[in-house]
Amino acid sequence: MNTLDYYNSKTDEFISSTVDVDFSKTQDKFLAKLSPKAHILDFGCGSGRDTKYFLEQGFKVTAIDGSVELCKFASEFAGVTVKQMYFQDLDEVDAYDGIWACASILHLHYGELQDVLGKMMRAVKDNGVIYTSFKYGTFEGERNGRYFTDCDEAKLAELLKCV
């Protein structure tokens, strides 16, 4: 099973474990770095939890996810159309004030991460903000039906040097 198959087949299980998690402390730190009504790309929006929160705070949000089933749920939950798109297909330039990639791009292989981080840098406006999160460590591979690239400080610094 690949990662998208996992999310498409275990949608309800994933949603029930994430949609009600209070992430406002981290979300608010991110939002504090943006202008009011800034345009945010929720890059791998999952259940739509963060998209909904950002919209409720008055921000403009474009939300994408690779999973067809998560896009369906998130669209209804957040009240906006969530576009089904793969991270590798991001091709916009200077389009967003902020990019929120919460526990999403960690599903890419290390080599893909370099390319996608570069695309994110091109898609965010000058002085824009990018948030991303990884599981801590150096593991790369399949875990519980999904692919993960974990990062510690050294691995993340190495990745960021390449973009």
Regions found by a protein language model. Give the residues of each.
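A conserved beta-strand element that flanks and buttresses the S-adenosyl-L-methionine
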Residues: 100-101
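Conserved acidic residues
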Residues: 97
